Amino acid sequence: MWAGSRLEFYQPLTVEADVTCVSTIINVEEKHGRTGSLLFVTVRHEYFQDGKRALQDEQDIVYREPTPPKLSGTEAIPQGQWRDPVVPSPTLLFRYSAVTFNGHRIHYDWPYVTQTEGYPGLVVHGPLIATLNLRAFTKAHPNARLKRFTFRGVRPLISPQPFEVGGRLIDSGKAQLWAGNQDGTAQIGEVEFSLGETP
């Protein structure tokens, strides 16, 4: 399961130009928690165009023993300066799985996710929530140039239950982002940015 990511934006990617991705496993750590053994794997993906690094994405992925899913949050979602409502349809989840080459059945196979994994419905991808959060941020701040974006999953969101993404400025060039619903916060994040034209 996706635990979180740290993205660094160095330069924009050019459409219709070749991109090289170099992926490296940078850390593997076993931990023991309330739900049993957990294996944390951190993978770094670096994207290059014309020999220059354009984007770096460090992903934290957790492998765990089968356990009942925790669906309730610990904190209510805050009131933000901007927010977008989302209704995650099964079609949206299927398409996101396809475009990201994500074959994990919890996102599109209803019998599997409900009968084998024990969730009440299809699980919304953590990166999809992050993508929707960045979209809401850039709609609210169209002149922002992204520098860094980090996010961490708190609990799963289930399709087709509505949720919202939103955020607020916390400093010059920094914003706090979140996603959640009536059950509480599901994802938290932070974006660093500068204002002005994209190079």
What are these regions (language model features)?
Residues 2-88, 157-160, 164-199:
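HotDog/MaoC-like acyl-thioester-processing domains
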Residues 9-13, 21-22, 87-88, 95-98, ...:
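Generic detector of short, locally flexible boundary/turn motifs and exposed helical patches
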Residues 11, 29-31, 105-106, 139-140, ...:
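Short secondary-structure boundary micro-motifs
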